[in-house]
Structure formats: C-alpha cells, structure tokens
C-alpha cells in the first residue's frame, strides 16, 4: 500500500515514513528544533547530548517572528501558546544616553505579542524538550560522542563504545562545537570582536529595593531600557510582567580574548559598575544590578568567526548547523531564530530529496541557508561596532540610528515556504555546477553600501 504524504510548508508526515534516519548531536535550541522538525517530516531521529540533564537555567533569550512562525505549527499550536504564556509583554525599548536623556524609542517590530518572544532561556528549552519527548523522539543524555564516521551509504557516531548508524549526522553542539573539526575538516579561526559582555539575571521574588524606576507598570507591559555611552552600552529588561530582570553590558575591550586564554574574566558586578563609574545614571542602574547573585553573572569576550564557506563533510552525509556553523553576536537577536530556520530547512530538504539523495539534501540545505546566515553574521558585527562607536552628532540629527533595524527580509522571512519554493532551483544549480542566486533578501551591496545599510532595507 502506498502512503500519500502531503508536501508543503505546513505539511507533516507519519512518523518514520521517509525511511531516513537522522543522528542529531546537541540538544540546545537548534538541536531540539532539528529533532522536532525532522520528526514532523517523517524522519527517524536519535539525538545525543553530553549533559546529564537539561536544566531550566539561564538569562533572557529573544525569539524573533521568523522563528516563532515555525514553532507555532508544533503540537497544533499548543507549543506556541505555552511560550506566549511565558513570554514578556513588550511594547517598546526606550533608549537613553548615559545622563538619562531620552534619545529614541524602538518599536520592537517582530517581538511584540503575537510576533515574537523574550523569555527565560531555560524555560524555552524545557518547553521544546517536553514537546520532543511527547513525540516519542529518542533523546539520550549523558552521552559523549567518541568518533564520527561516514561511508558512501551511511554516516554515524560511536557513543560510549556503541556504533550508531544513520543516513546522516547533524551537529548542533554550539559555538564551541567538538563535531565541527571532524565534519568540515578544520577548526576555523576564532577571534575577538573587540568587545566583551557582562550578563546577569535575577528574579523579583524578593523586592528589589531601588528598582521602582524599572519595575513600575510591569503589570501592564514589560520594560526594556537601554543606556548608551562611549564604548559601553547597558540594557535592562523585565520578563514575565516583572517576575525576572535580565541585564547586559557590552563594552569595548580589544584584549579580553587574549586575557581569557590565561584566566577567565572575573564575572563580578563590580567590574560592570566600574565601566559606568562616571555616568550620571550609575546610581540608578547600580541599585538594580547589585541584587544579582554572583552565580547568575557572566563576563566573556564576544568572539567571531568569518562566515564559513562549507558546512558539510567530504562524504556529504554530515553537516553542522546553528551556532556550530554561524555564531551571532547578541545585538543581532537572531542566534536562536537562525538555528531554528536551519532545523526547519534541514527537515524539508531531506523530505524532498528522499533517502537515496541524502547528500544532495544536505548540499541544498547549505546552499539555501549559508548566504543568509553569512550576511547576518557580518551585519551583526557592523551593528555592534556602530553601537560601541556612536557618532553622537549624527545621532542628534537622526535619533532613529540607535534603533535596531528589523527589516522584513529578516523578521518576515518564511523559511519553510522559501525552502519549498527554492529547492528545485537549488538542486538544478548543484547538478549543473552553476552559481545559485537566492530569492528574496536585501539587494546586493553596491557603491560602497555598508552592511548596516543592508540591514535597513525593508524588503
């Protein structure tokens, strides 16, 4: 009996109907999304993570509309509804200078209710993990991969001495990926972006004395406030109607990465306060972040890699996605979203190519996804540098320069419809060994046009 399987961006397939077995390494946001999306398209999934358990910890994470439109299809909409209950209720980000003078309002397009989410990172991963378990996906924790291998017909891993065989291996093990070298054959250079970041979070179960300026009116909407100075900017945000406060401070530091090789930066609030010691707004900001427990403070260099030219192994049956392939700076607000886009497109290209053409599916995934992520990587670095080298006379003329560009080609992107639309064109380009020109996105940069200008293209 032939099983009819609907094909389209909203379609699902019966479990295990494709005959394709996928091994997923890493159960962060990207890995969980890959497991769920592959299951939805009828692929058999076995996933591994070295963690003993997936703990519901972490600070805030932004999930933009281009990712939420994927998640909203899970569990007949129930997963999206649950995230909506956990998410902040955002209206605007208010931007000030270091004296507290109002500069501009950012309308947060793509993150408002019904569009995107700002929520605790740990709770997002827990909701995704719970949904994956409800689907019966085989997920194995406390599992360390010892070896990666592939041949003409299969690929797999050796985990704790056991050889696991599949049609392909998908590594989603983060920016410090151990799989990456085995898959693409080398370890790309990691270098400093020229800046470091302090991050911290706290709950408001105990009253935060001196924080009324941030917590007032959170019964109506959560608050996001940004303070911009010379070489330093600070963001404070409430989450879940003021139940949690998340903050970060990004600052110039060209030597932070080199010092980290000798000793990690000290993750102390004092270090962050020192950066704003001369700010008129210091007292107000300090009154809130002083409540952060030491265990909830991080301080680390913001590292970058040049966009990779290839995500696949030589044999074509192993691939890296998410932060393992394209780490983003926090200012982009797209790290999680791009990992989820990768996951959705992976499941679709495998579905369309079929079991006999798995290497072609992974090649098509790379062709569709790599140009978009490479452009976003480069533009996020330019955006970060703009914020740390603010041209105040220009901002005086146009305060909107300090708002974060959120063009339709990023936040309005439907990665699933795009994959179905482009798949045949991509396959033809691969088979004919021709250059593939992606549909959609910004115009190519010409006449010295900056990447930041491309970000402001609302196409």
Curated annotation (Swiss-Prot):
One of its GO terms (molecular function) is monooxygenase activity. Its cofactor is FAD. The keyword Flavoprotein applies. Signal peptide: none annotated. The active site is at residue 199. It catalyses: asperlicin C + NADPH + O2 + H(+) = asperlicin E + NADP(+) + H2O; asperlicin C + NADH + O2 + H(+) = asperlicin E + NAD(+) + H2O. It is an enzyme of class 1 (oxidoreductase). Its EC number is 1.14.13.216. Keywords: FAD, Flavoprotein, Monooxygenase, NAD, NADP, Oxidoreductase. It comes from the Eukaryota. InterPro entries: FAD-bd, FAD-dep_Monooxygenase_BioMet, FAD/NAD-bd_sf. FAD binds at residues 49, 62, 121, 323, 336. The keyword NAD applies. Catalyzes the conversion of asperlicin A to form asperlicin E, a potent cholecystokinin receptor CCK(A) antagonist. Belongs to the paxM FAD-dependent monooxygenase family. This is Asperlicin C monooxygenase. It comes from Petromyces alliaceus (Aspergillus alliaceus). The gene is aspB.
């Amino acid at each position: 009996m032939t099983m009819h399987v609907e094909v389209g961006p909203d379609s699902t397939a019966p479990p295990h109907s494709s005959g394709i077995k996928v091994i997923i390494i890493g159960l962060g946001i990207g890995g969980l999304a890959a497991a769920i999306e592959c299951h939805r398209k009828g692929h058999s999934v076995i996933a591994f993570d070295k963690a003993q358990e997936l703990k519901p910890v972490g600070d805030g994470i932004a999930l933009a509309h281009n990712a939420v439109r994927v998640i909203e299809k899970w569990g007949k909409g129930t997963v999206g509804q649950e995230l909506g209950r956990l998410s902040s209720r955002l209206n605007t980000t208010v931007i000030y200078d270091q004296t507290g003078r109002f500069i501009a309002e950012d309308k947060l397009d793509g993150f408002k209710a019904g569009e995107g989410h700002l929520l605790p990172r740990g709770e997002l991963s827990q909701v995704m993990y719970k949904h994956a378990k409800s689907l019966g996906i085989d997920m194995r924790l406390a599992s360390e991969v010892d070896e990666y291998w592939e041949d003409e017909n299969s690929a797999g891993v050796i985990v704790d001495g056991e050889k696991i065989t599949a049609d392909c291996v998908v590594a989603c093990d983060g920016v410090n990926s151990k799989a990456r070298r085995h898959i693409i054959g080398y370890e790309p250079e990691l270098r400093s972006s020229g800046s470091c970041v302090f991050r911290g979070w706290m709950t408001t179960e105990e009253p935060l004395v001196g924080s009324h300026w941030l917590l007032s009116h959170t019964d109506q909407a959560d608050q996001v406030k940004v303070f911009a100075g010379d070489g330093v900017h600070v963001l404070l945000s409430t989450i879940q109607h003021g139940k949690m406060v998340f903050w970060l401070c990004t600052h110039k530091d060209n030597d932070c990465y080199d010092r980290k090789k000798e000793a990690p930066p000290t993750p102390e609030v004092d270090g962050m306060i020192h950066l704003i010691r001369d700010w008129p707004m210091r007292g107000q900001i300090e009154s809130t972040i002083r409540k952060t427990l030491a265990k909830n403070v991080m301080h680390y260099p913001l590292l970058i890699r040049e966009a990779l030219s290839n995500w696949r192994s030589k044999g074509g049956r192993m691939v890296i996605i998410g932060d393992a392939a394209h780490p983003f700076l926090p200012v982009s607000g797209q790290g999680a979203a791009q990992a989820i886009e990768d996951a959705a497109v992976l499941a679709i290209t495998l579905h369309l190519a079929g079991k006999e053409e798995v290497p072609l599916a992974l090649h098509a995934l790379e062709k569709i996804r790599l140009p978009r992520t490479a452009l976003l990587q480069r533009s996020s670095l330019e955006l970060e540098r703009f914020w740390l080298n603010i041209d105040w006379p220009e901002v005086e003329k146009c305060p909107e320069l300090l708002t974060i560009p959120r063009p339709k080609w990023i936040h309005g992107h439907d990665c699933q419809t795009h994959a179905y639309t482009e798949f045949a064109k991509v396959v033809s380009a691969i088979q004919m060994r021709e250059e593939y020109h992606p549909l959609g996105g910004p115009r190519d940069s010409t006449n010295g046009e900056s990447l930041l200008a491309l970000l402001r293209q609302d196409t």
